[in-house]
Amino acid sequence: MAQKEKDALSGVETTGHEWDGLRELNNPLPKWWLYIFYVCIAWSLVYYVLYPAWPLGKSYTKGLLGYSQREELVQKVADGKKAQEKYLTAIAATSVEDIQKNKDLLAFAMAGGRSYFNENCAACHGAGGQGAKGFPTLADDVWLWGGTTADIYKTIQHGIRADDGDTRGTVGIGMTAFGRDGILNRDQIGQVAEYILSLNKRSTDAAAAEKGKTVYDENCAACHGENAQGSLAVGMEVGAPPLVTGNWLYGGDKATLVQTITNGRAGVMPAWSKRLDDATIKSLAVYVHNLGGGK
């Protein structure tokens, strides 16, 4: 039988290991640590009996309590939907204008609308409705198809030049490609671009801008208005933007204006009624209207 070695100074047995003259003492674990360890073992055994614990092929031990986090989640989701149901039903039965007048419905629609917007609209229009090139800003007061709550609701519901019988605009038809279709020559396009720049006090060629006014009156005023205030200002629903506000969907520099006049533009927005229910669309309309630019 091997002789147990003890440390001469402390009198404690060593483990027999030695590193560079250092020996490891074989002190027992503290009692408080052992007690906690034993309690943990006991608790784990109780847990195994009461709660789901061990996998069994495609199943698992259910435990005496029959607890399931999945079932708890399903129940909580169901409870949440039930709590929302009365508001969703009320919103579906209320016009978008009247939702704005009801404090409780407005608060619910704004909260839901923000979530729906981030999920469905922010990818194009930005998280704050700030827009991007080719996608209009929704947080200002410049609207191509109307900025009332009813207008916004209709736009979201039926889309712009979308595959929907009540879509706004006409599918496949947008701004005329004046250069590509041979309606205006290069000089005329440059002149009308200078005229538009002059309306925004940015023209560098007064003579070309003066000639451009004639070209504009003959070719552009029918949609954009004589004073370039946009189609809504002249009572038309064609989505022609105002050209005097400094808000540009594709860019307001001369090169971009020339490109736009030459090739035309025909923005498209999907009809969300094919994906979202009416209460969701109304909540979105209310939320967008309250981003800051609603009429």
Curated annotation (Swiss-Prot):
Topological category with respect to the lipid bilayer: Single-pass membrane protein
Spans within the Periplasmic topological domain: 53-295
Cofactor note: Binds 2 heme C groups per subunit.
Entry binding sites for heme c 2: 175, 220, 223-224
Pathway: Energy metabolism; oxidative phosphorylation
A molecular-function term among this protein's GO annotations: oxidoreductase activity
Chief place of localization: membrane
Subcellular location: Cell inner membrane
This protein's UniProt keywords: Cell inner membrane, Cell membrane, Electron transport, Heme, Hydrogen ion transport, Ion transport, Iron, Membrane, Metal-binding, Oxidoreductase, Repeat, Respiratory chain, Transmembrane, Transmembrane helix, Transport
GO biological process, one term: proton transmembrane transport
Binding positions (heme c 1): 121, 124-125, 269
Cytochrome c domain span: 108-200, 207-292
Cofactor: heme c
One Gene Ontology cellular component: plasma membrane
Entry's transmembrane regions: 32-52
Cytoplasmic side stretches: 1-31
SUPFAM superfamilies documented for this protein: Cytochrome c
Subunit record text: Component of the cbb3-type cytochrome c oxidase at least composed of CcoN, CcoO, CcoQ and CcoP.
Function statement: C-type cytochrome. Part of the cbb3-type cytochrome c oxidase complex. CcoP subunit is required for transferring electrons from donor cytochrome c via its heme groups to CcoO subunit. From there, electrons are shuttled to the catalytic binuclear center of CcoN subunit where oxygen reduction takes place. The complex also functions as a proton pump.
Alphabetical list of NCBIfam families matching this protein: ccoP
Family classification: Belongs to the CcoP / FixP family.
Protein's recorded name: Cbb3-type cytochrome c oxidase subunit CcoP
Gene from which the chain derives: ccoP
